[in-house]
């Protein structure tokens, strides 16, 4: 009677492993080949990169080294009087180092990068021009606003000086018993007038041969009225003083305008 087989023994396991010996072996071979191909591709890329680096290094070294006498072109230059290390040109201020090479490594066409650079510079220049024009317009608008404000302030100041002159003229004329002003606008008009008085005054103004006062500007009225005050009453509204005589007025008053008193 044969001995009972031990399924856990090495002989049984080895027999079972050898049932299909080709299947796992093929899988291992394919995996090894795949790894080997990847390694070869990586080595090839590294080798190509190293070749490019070596080419660049050799090129840089060659450009840094001066040409020797064995170079035919350099020998011809020497015969023409050129010396090694000498700058080009009659004045001797030309370049000494060789013109560097710009190796193109990208895939874009020739001139594409320079075109992009030129367009970028144009966009930047247009942006700067717009900013400059905007700043100019803002400065112009601010200056116009200041001028309008100054003009308005000057107009208000002139109107204030005219009212002061009218008030002073009315008081000084009254001191001399002058009942009617030389011109209607020399005195301040009453704040409240009846409609009949206004209509009568309008008729009188229409009958006058001279130009109506409305044709005069505030500045013109002020100049006329201050001249009347100085001539008739020896009075200056900016000094606020009635002088004794014309000599006293001319000696102590700075002048007939507001600017003279600034």
From Swiss-Prot:
Pfam families: DUF4187, G-patch. Residues 28-61 form a coiled coil. It is found in: Chromosome, Centromere, Kinetochore. Residues 69-115 form the G-patch domain. Residues 28-39, 50-60 have a biased composition (Basic and acidic residues). The modification Phosphoserine is found at residue 115. This is G patch domain-containing protein 11. Its main location: nucleus. One of its GO terms (molecular function) is nucleic acid binding. One of its GO terms (cellular component) is kinetochore. Belongs to the GPATCH11 family. It comes from Mus musculus (Mouse). InterPro entries: DUF4187, G_patch_dom, GPATCH11.
């Amino acid at each position: 009677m044969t001995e009972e087989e031990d399924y856990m023994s090495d002989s049984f396991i080895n027999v079972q492993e050898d049932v299909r010996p080709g299947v796992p072996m093929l899988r291992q071979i394919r995996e090894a080949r795949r790894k080997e191909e990847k390694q070869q591709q990586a080595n090839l890329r590294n080798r190509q990169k190293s070749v490019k680096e070596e080419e660049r290094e050799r090129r840089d070294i060659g450009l840094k080294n001066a040409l020797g006498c064995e170079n035919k072109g350099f020998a011809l230059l020497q015969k023409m009087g050129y010396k090694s290390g000498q700058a080009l040109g009659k004045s001797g201020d030309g370049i000494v180092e060789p013109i560097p090479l710009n190796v193109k490594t990208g895939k874009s066409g020739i001139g594409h990068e320079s075109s992009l650079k030129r367009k970028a510079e144009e966009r930047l220049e247009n942006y700067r021009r717009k900013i400059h024009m905007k700043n100019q317009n803002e400065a112009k608008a601010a200056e116009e606003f200041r001028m309008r404000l100054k003009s308005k302030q000057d107009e208000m100041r002139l109107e204030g000086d005219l009212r002061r002159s009218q008030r002073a003229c009315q008081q000084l004329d009254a001191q001399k018993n002058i009942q009617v002003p030389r011109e209607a606008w020399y005195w301040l008009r009453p704040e409240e007038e009846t409609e009949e008085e206004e209509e009568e005054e309008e008729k009188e103004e229409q009958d006058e041969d001279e130009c109506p006062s409305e044709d005069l500007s505030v500045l013109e009225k002020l100049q006329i009225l201050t001249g009347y005050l100085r001539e008739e009453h020896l009075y200056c509204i900016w000094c606020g003083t009635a002088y004794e005589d014309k000599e006293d007025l001319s000696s102590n008053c700075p002048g007939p305008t507001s600017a003279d008193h600034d």
